[in-house]
Curated annotation (Swiss-Prot):
GO terms for biological process, alphabetical: proteolysis
A GO term for molecular function: metalloendopeptidase activity
Residue sites binding Zn(2+) per the record: 429, 433
Protein name: Extracellular metalloproteinase 2
Induction: Expression is strongly increased during growth on protein-rich medium containing keratin.
UniProt-listed PANTHER family: EXTRACELLULAR METALLOPROTEINASE MEP
């Protein structure tokens, strides 16, 4: 394999932007579906490590049980009269914690928003768990016996009409799939792939409702619409696999073209650990001379259409991807540079996250999982200069085994226009949606960041990772960072406040979430809290200048990578659709698992400063608590 020469930025990848070029906290595309009125209500419960340790003394274990059997026993003992199935996405994380996920059923039909996740420690005992199982009255009769529900085609028509989807169903035919009561629709137009439907229950307002879960990928939205099984113009709830935001980037360490110049980099996979065993241009079966490999397929998409496989990519038999860029050029004049930049940024981030624990078993994005678990066949499709929009970006995350899809847009906020592919923060923010949606609730369930507060954390994680990666040697606790400033051509960035540990510069506390009804604003609060976490850990452990983390006893040795690792591990512990308090507890539990709780007080100091103190009680009204634990 020839050496790869990238005229990409070898420094730092920035972060993500909220989607609109003004400081209104909104990421809704003008042509998209507003799912806010259809979000599921929060129902998750989480038993953090301390409470779990006290509870499981009375729980019966067998030394012969594997971690899946132990987890199954816990669910059975907690809900002895309920039925459920084991989701086939269990794995043991790089921190030694086993993760097992369960889906509640009724009459053999999934209750789609009723989940139970169990995390098993190295000692074989339950470490933490969470659940949103339905505990109300079950339907007495099996709906499959009387078949007293609508035809799935009517459900598709109802979703299209109610949500005003750009899909034409006139000739739709429901073709049965192998899985019971699951159908693919043929004869439609307007969607990027054939719509699907599956008969499921959902819990809502204390009752179970039988619905058709209608799946439609229309580009700006990839929706799961829960259509009433009888009244098919009633849509109970909607989940969107697509997450939007606005950002810009240059290279690893450089946030955007204002921070440095393009740098020649040779064989970058040699410095990014074991995440890419086939290099960035092979998948174990094929070697490519274009910007495609096991992790990423990067190409332009000026039409904004669904096709990507045969779209234009830079091609170099010598793997010398060296192209010109100037701020005086229009984006279409440097598309080779932009595609190469996007390919470099996403592959580097893939490898960094791999080292931190986003592996094949955890549901990462790869064509060939090389026998290491997970589903495979799901590398990320990354479109540069996508013509389906401007001044934004998005990432669609279906379950493990289906391709993630990133669409990066140009920005018309300056003359000449600017290309979001050159602001690493935007790229990192978007790819982080793939990370969080695969880890929260398990790789097979991409519905676990749909509720408003949980969805806000999905946005906040994107900002957090983009900002953490952007930090530079010489930065201190007093260093502030904005979001999307270059791409949006907006001094101060696109968020309400810059990320800062100074309460005068950024006064956000958890109580501010009370008045918010949009995920990007909530995400800014969550990322503000995590910025405090980041700097407390850097103050304790320092900050490495290396791209990849170094580990001591399984934990990153520097504060930046430790913060990124604990936040990632926390995602794997928390329940489906968590709230801020549950996410806080999961991060503290992640530290307990990784370092035996050495950083508990540094973490709680950060959370307490912003209102999530030791005595905070989650309720309808969010009231700050600034208390530290007694043992700190």
């Amino acid at each position: 394999m020839h050496g790869l020469l990238l005229a990409g930025l070898a420094a730092a990848l920035p972060l993500g932007v909220a989607g609109l070029p003004a400081r209104q906290q909104s990421g809704l595309s003008p042509r998209g579906v507003d799912i806010n009125p259809y979000r599921f209500a929060s129902m998750a419960k989480y038993s953090e490590h301390k409470s779990t340790s006290q509870m499981v003394h009375s729980f019966s274990y067998s030394k012969d049980d594997d971690y899946v059997a132990t987890a199954t026993k816990l669910v059975k003992s907690t809900f002895p009269n309920m039925t459920f199935r084991t989701v086939k996405d269990h794995y043991i994380g790089t921190n030694g914690i086993g993760h097992v996920h369960f889906k509640q059923t009724a009459h053999g039909i999934d209750i789609d928003n009723a989940d139970f996740n169990v995390n098993i420690g190295r000692d074989g005992k339950v470490f933490t768990f969470g659940n949103s199982f339905y505990e109300g009255e079950m339907p007495k009769t099996n709906p499959l016996t009387k078949r007293d529900f609508s035809d799935p085609v009517k459900a598709l028509q109802g979703a299209i009409k109610t949500l005003k989807l750009p899909v034409k169903p006139q000739s739709a035919k429901a073709m049965p799939m192998k899985e019971a009561e699951t159908f693919k629709f043929e004869g439609t137009s307007g969607a990027l792939s054939d719509p699907m439907a599956k008969l499921v229950y959902i819990q809502k307002d204390g009752k179970l409702h039988l619905t058709w879960r209608v799946e439609t990928d229309v580009g700006d939205n990839w929706l799961l619409s829960y259509v009433d099984s009888k009244e098919t113009e009633t849509v109970h709830n909607v989940v969107d696999y697509v997450a939007s935001a606005d950002y810009k980037v240059f290279a690893w360490g450089l946030n955007d073209p204002t921070e440095g110049q393009p740098t020649m980099i040779k064989d970058p996979w040699n410095t990014t650990g074991t995440g890419s065993p086939f290099t960035w241009h092979g998948d174990g079966q094929m070697d490519y001379t274009v910007t495609r490999g096991n992790n990423i397929a990067a190409q332009d998409n000026p039409s904004g259409g669904e096709q990507w496989e045969n779209n234009y990519r830079p091609d170099s038999p010598e793997l010398s991807f060296v192209y010109e860029y100037s701020e005086q050029m229009e984006p279409d004049q440097y598309k080779d540079f932009a595609i190469t930049q996007l390919f470099y940024t996403t592959n580097t981030y893939h490898d960094v996250l791999y080292a931190l624990g986003f592996t094949e078993e955890a549901g990462n994005f790869q064509m060939n999982n090389n026998g290491k678990g997970g589903e495979g066949n799901d590398f990320a499709i990354c479109n540069a200069q996508d013509g389906s929009g401007t001044n934004n970006a998005n990432f669609a995350t279906p379950p493990d085994g289906q391709n993630g899809r990133m669409r990066m847009y140009t920005w018309t906020t300056a003359q000449p226009s600017r290309d979001g592919d050159l602001e690493a923060g935007i790229v990192i923010h978007e790819y982080t949606h793939g990370l969080s949606n695969r880890l929260c609730g398990g790789p097979a369930n991409s519905n676990c960041l749909n509720e408003l507060e949980a969805g806000g954390m999905g946005e906040g994680w994107g900002d957090f990772y983009a900002t953490a990666i952007r930090l530079k040697q010489g930065d201190t606790h007093d260093t502030d960072y904005t979001m999307g400033e270059w791409a949006a051509n907006m001094k101060g960035g696109i968020r309400e406040y810059p990320y800062s540990t100074n309460m005068q510069t950024n006064p956000y506390t958890y109580a501010d979430v009370q008045g918010m009804d949009e995920v990007h604003g909530i995400g800014t609060v969550w990322a503000t809290i995590l910025y405090e976490v980041l700097w407390n850990l850097i103050d304790e452990h320092g900050m490495s200048k290396n791209i990849m983390p170094k580990f001591v006893n399984g934990a990153p040795s520097d504060g930046r990578n430790l913060a990124m690792k604990l936040v990632l591990d926390g995602m794997t512990l928390m329940p489906c659709n968590p709230n801020f308090m549950q996410a806080r507890d999961a991060i503290i539990d992640a530290d307990q698992a990784l370092t035996n709780g050495q950083n508990k007080c540094a973490l709680m100091k950060a959370f307490s400063k912003r209102g999530l103190g030791a005595n905070y009680k989650h309720g309808k009204n969010r009231v700050n608590n600034f208390d530290m634990p007694a043992d700190c």
